[in-house]
Regions:
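N-terminal core-binding DNA-recognition domain of tyrosine recombinases/integrases
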Residues: 29-44, 54-151, 183
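Conserved tyrosine-mediated DNA breakage-rejoining catalytic core shared by Y-recombinases
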Residues: 208, 212-254
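N-terminal DNA-binding module of tyrosine recombinases/phage integrases
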Residues: 2-39, 61-62
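DNA breakage-rejoining catalytic core of tyrosine-based enzymes
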Residues: 142-182, 222, 235-250
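Basic, Lys/Arg- and aromatic-enriched nucleic-acid-binding interface segment
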Residues: 168-207, 211, 242
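Major-groove DNA-contacting interfaces characterized by cationic-aromatic clusters
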Residues: 95-96, 163-167, 229-230, 250-255
C-alpha cells in the first residue's frame, strides 16, 4: 500500500489518497479523506490520517480481516503490530523483547484518533462499528469544584471518549536560552533569514504562519502582524485556519 498526493477535480484543493497493492484507491478511506478535504481540513492533517489508515488497512490485509467486522481484540493486535519494526511485521521473524518499540505511545494514540474519526464517519452511513473505538459514558461533573454556567443543562448528557488509549508521557517543549537565540541571529548571513528567525522569536508564531506572511500583513504604526489563512505558493498554512493579530516589537519592525 502507498499514500499519494492528489488534487480534487472540482476545487483543485490538495488532498491525499491511499492506494492498495492492486493500485486502486482504498474506497472507504478515499471517501473519508475526500470528506475532510471538502470541509477544508488541513492538508497536513489529511496526509497524517492517510498514513494512519494505510497502516490499519495493511494490518487488516495481512490478517485477512474485514474492516467492517473488526473486534476489540483486533485493535489490540494492531497496536502490538505497530510497535514492531516494519521489516518484521509480516510475522516471519521473531522479535526479542529487548528491541525498542518502533511506534511511540503518542503516535499510536494519534492513529487511534484517526481510526475513531474514520469509523464515526462510516457509522453515519450504516456501518455499525464506530462504537468499537468511541464509547459513551454518562455525563458527570468535571474534576474539582468548578462548574460551568450551564452545567445543570448538560450534566446528564453522555460524553464521548475513545475506548482504547495508550498512556503517553507528557513531553515538555524545548526552549532556547537568550544566548542561544542571539547566537542564531548573529549567525544569519542574510537579512531575510535574520528577519524570519526574529519574527519567530518575537511573535511566537508557527513556522508555517511566518512563511505565509506578506507585506500587507504588517501594520507598522500599530506594531502588529496579522496572520491570515490563505493559499500560498510555498504551501505554508495557518494551523486551524484561524486568523489573528499579534503585537510585535518596534525592534522587529525596524528590520
Amino acid at each position: 500500500m502507498r499514500v499519494q498526493r492528489v488534487w480534487m477535480p472540482d476545487s483543485g484543493a490538495e488532498s491525499w489518497m491511499v492506494f492498495g497493492d492492486d493500485h486502486a484507491p482504498v474506497a472507504p478511506v478515499e471517501r473519508w479523506l475526500a470528506h475532510l478535504t471538502v470541509i477544508e481540513r488541513s492538508s497536513n492533517t489529511i496526509k497524517g490520517y492517510a498514513h494512519d489508515l494505510k497502516d490499519w488497512f495493511a494490518f487488516l490485509q495481512l490478517h485477512r480481516l474485514d474492516w467492517r467486522r473488526v473486534q476489540l481484540e483486533d485493535l489490540g493486535g494492531f497496536l502490538a503490530w505497530l510497535r514492531l519494526p516494519p521489516r518484521v511485521r509480516d510475522g516471519r521473524v521473531l522479535v526479542l523483547a529487548s528491541v525498542e518499540h518502533h511506534c511511540s505511545q503518542a503516535s499510536a494514540n494519534r492513529k487511534l484518533s484517526a481510526l475513531a474519526g474514520f469509523y464515526q464517519f462510516h457509522a453515519r452511513h450504516g456501518i455499525d462499528v464506530g462504537e468499537l473505538l468511541i464509547g459513551l459514558r454518562p455525563g458527570g461533573p468535571p474534576g474539582g469544584s468548578w462548574r460551568p454556567l450551564l452545567h445543570h443543562l448538560a450534566k446528564h448528557q453522555p460524553q464521548r471518549r475513545r475506548t482504547v488509549k495508550l498512556p503517553a508521557p507528557r513531553r515538555q517543549p524545548r526552549v532556547l536560552t537568550a544566548r542561544q537565540v542571539q547566537a542564531i541571529l548573529d549567525a544569519c548571513e542574510h537579512l531575510r533569514d535574520r528577519l524570519l528567525f526574529a519574527v519567530l522569536v518575537d511573535s511566537g508564531m508557527r513556522i508555517g504562519e511566518a512563511l505565509g506572511l506578506r507585506h500587507a500583513d504588517l501594520a507598522i504604526a500599530e506594531r502588529q502582524v496579522t496572520i491570515t489563512p490563505r493559499a500560498n505558493d510555498n504551501r505554508a498554512r495557518v494551523k486551524g485556519g484561524m486568523s489573528r493579530t499579534i503585537p510585535v516589537s518596534a525592534e522587529l519592525l525596524r528590520l
